[in-house]
Amino acid sequence: MKKIAVTSERSYEVEIGRSYLEALIEIAQGRERVAVIYSEAMKEQIPTFDFGGAEAFYFGIADGEAGKSARTLESIWNWLGAAGFTRSDLIIGIGGGAVTDLAGYAAASWLRGLDWVAVPTTVAGMVDAAIGGKTGVNSEYGKNLIGAFHSPSQVIIDLKWLETLSDRDYAAGLAEVVKTGFISDVTILDLLDGKNIKSIRKN
């Protein structure tokens, strides 16, 4: 897998390729417990992990912003407590931006900070939501009002997840690609200019 270093107060690597299972198993080595938080809409696509001695716990949440709530977060806290999660254990978030935001904030707030890994499965998640360490949940007064900066230990981008997206969802994520291009590198826009969604996905 290709690796890109992200330098910050809590530096980490973004791995890009097609073998996220191997990468997760490697980072879970030496842990006693691993929590896998995922979208219920993806339940059939989430494998039963063999973390080589670490006990795996699975927590499915409602799809999209509906699952990114303080109530869901409280359920995760209770679940982590019942399972005996300690500072040396690991949280993994597999899904779109709502899932990685929630998993990251659960990690930030439990015992003042657990390691966590983001496995984004959408274009927007791969380009924006899982990168940078912004984590949080929504409240009844607005989106992302409760949160913290807590960078992941690792971001694992498996390009195979893109094959599961509809053209509509794929195209929606390209808006984040365009935004990133304007902010960071306008040459990115050349990859999209004059192309339809079919040709972009093919390449």
Language-model segments: residues:
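A glycine/threonine-rich phosphate-anchoring loop and its flanking beta-alpha core
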Residues: 105-198
